[in-house]
Regions:
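Long, compositionally biased intrinsically disordered regions
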Residues: 2-42, 192, 217, 356, ...
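C-terminal, active-site-flanking charged/polar segments
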Residues: 283, 393-428, 437, 453-458
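Intrinsically disordered, low-complexity boundary segments flanking structured domains
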Residues: 219-224, 391, 412-421, 469-476
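Conserved catalytic alpha/beta cores of large enzymes that bind or transform nucleotide phosphates
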Residues: 130-141, 158, 289, 294, ...
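Domain-scale recognition of functional cores that engage charged ligands
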Residues: 10, 14, 39-382, 386, ...
Length: 510
């Protein structure tokens, strides 16, 4: 089935033949739906809403934690995502026959264009290209030249850049910030240590890395002075060893016109490898486009500190218990206390655990506690697309908290569909991760991935249909075997930009 060229390609990518065969088997068999127990909610205890007093305690816990310079905190931002989908309607207008805006979306775009953070740059470019501003061109009815200058390679090239590098927010004095810069500001506000050091890591695509590095050099100096921060910014790219094989409808490998195997990027789940490479104690994870201007940052900062304070508090308790368990001389009464912590605070529920005693119970407690831990913010469901928080049955019959996408749930089962639709909260991708064990050693994060939680989608290449394989999502199956806690955070912390017109919402205006 494989030829000499195939083996060379596999070797170059760092993919074994065994991995290739497993991917093809997954594409043929598909992935099972997950077995739901319930949608996590405030009512059933799956989502936690701390009282004001408890919130204060967690905020203090985080301040104490970052005050210790031996603690290494990193803010991790997946930033390779292209902005092209943001401008889908603009591309359609540009390619269409109408010379004037003929949809509500395009009318709204031109109505609000004067508020855009990128207007200054756009007008400069239009002056170069046409000797006129956007206002003048619009007055003349030349809408398409404005859109072409925003999206095209002769203009600002926004249609082909990553979202992280687009100007999102306009500030006084004609200054503006990209999401990249807003994440630097956020980092200074909640991830700065006692020496003023702020560490951020961005995953980027190879073709845009130099643009990130250029912006990083100037932004880290300017914002470092403004926020008394010493930035340490690093970048990585998705590893080619995480690419996945494409398949024909019959499950055989898809080949390009030249006969070579077609591999595709494995989706954001591939970034568990990048996350694993980071040398840190605590890692904040957040999507690149969920940023707010300064006037709205307070909620975000406070709630990030809250999540982190809860995490280090839970972790400290888990570590203390693990030290006792490792020594081995633990009474049955003490083990029942630890089991209660595991079930009530870390939401690991298992009927069989209650039938264990002695060494069997000790071993169970040790194994379950000695895992990476994540605390995830969850916002009230307001109909936004995306995954949600659920209580899910594991293969051993135990129940744990998981973030699921709709494709992981059997929507043909009315009961399951109802659970999904009645979910009170959804996942804004707002995580704090503890990635070291109680001995200070880093966990090997790929060991905690559930390989049976990938995704299959239908795509096409050169006019031919293909099956594409996505690895278990970074905050879905890639963190399936972590200890997980869900906490309610306000909707004000969730301001994603999915279309260019989202930038004109009040949440993105200064």
């Amino acid at each position: 089935m494989l030829n000499e060229q195939d083996y060379k390609l596999l070797a170059a990518k760092g993919i074994t033949e065994q991995q290739l065969n497993q991917q093809l088997a997954d594409l043929r068999a598909g992935f099972p739906f997950l077995e739901l127990s319930a949608a996590a909610s405030l009512d059933n205890g799956g989502i936690y809403a701390p009282t004001p007093e408890v919130r204060k305690a967690y905020l203090r816990a985080w301040q104490d934690y970052v005050a210790d310079v031996d603690h290494k905190v990193v803010k991790f931002v997946p930033a390779s995502g292209a902005a092209s989908r943001m401008f889908k309607d603009l591309f359609t207008f540009l390619d269409g026959t109408s010379e004037t805006p003929d949809t509500d979306f395009m009318k709204s775009f031109f109505e609000h264009l004067p508020q855009a953070a990128f207007l200054h740059d756009l007008d400069q470019k239009l002056q170069e290209l046409h000797g006129k501003t956007s206002e003048q061109l619009v007055a003349e009815g030349d809408y398409k030249s404005v859109v072409a200058a925003l999206l095209g390679t002769r203009g600002l090239n926004y249609g082909h850049l990553p979202k992280a590098l687009l100007k999102f927010h306009r500030y006084e004095g004609d200054t503006s910030r990209t999401p990249f810069e807003e994440h630097l500001v956020e980092g200074a506000l909640y991830a700065k240590n006692a020496e003023g050091k702020v560490q951020l890591h961005f995953t980027v695509s190879p073709e845009h890395r130099s643009l990130f590095e250029t912006l990083s050099a100037t932004a880290s100096q300017q914002l470092g002075a403004q926020y008394q921060a010493q930035y340490d910014i690093s970048f990585s790219e998705q590893k080619s060893s995480t690419d996945t094989i494409a398949a024909n409808a019959d499950g055989t490998p898809f080949r390009n016109a030249d006969g070579s195997l077609l591999f595709r990027p494995g989706g954001h789940g591939a970034l568990i490898e990048n996350l694993n490479d980071i040398d840190a104690d605590i890692i904040f994870v957040k999507t690149v486009d969920n940023v707010s201007p300064d006037r709205l940052k307070e909620d975000t900062v406070t709630n990030k500190q809250l999540l982190a304070g809860l995490l280090v508090s839970l972790q400290a308790q888990a570590f203390a218990y693990l030290e006792e368990l490792e020594e081995g001389n633990v009474s049955e009464e003490r083990m029942q206390e630890i089991l209660h912590f595991l079930e009530k605070d870390l939401h690991c529920q298992s009927d069989t655990a209650h039938g264990l005693e002695g060494l069997e119970l000790l071993d169970y407690l040790y194994t379950r506690l000695n895992r990476p831990i994540r605390v995830c913010g969850m916002v009230r469901n307001v109909g936004e697309p995306g995954g949600g928080p659920f209580m899910v049955y594991n293969a051993d019959g135990s129940i744990s908290l998981q973030i699921l996408e709709s494709s992981q749930i059997d929507m043909n089962d009315p009961a399951k569909k109802r659970l999904f639709e009645e979910g009170t909260h959804f996942n804004p991708v707002d995580l704090v991760c503890g990635v070291r064990d109680f001995n200070g050693e880093k966990f090997h994060l790929p060991d905690f991935v559930d390989p049976s939680t990938g995704f299959i989608s239908h795509k096409s290449k050169d006019g031919k249909e293909l099956l594409a394989l996505e690895l278990p999502g970074l905050w879905n199956g890639a963190m399936s075997d972590w200890n997980t806690v869900f906490v309610e955070v306000p909707l004000s912390t969730f301001n994603p930009v999915k279309t260019v017109n989202d930038l004109f919402r009040p949440q993105h205006q200064v």
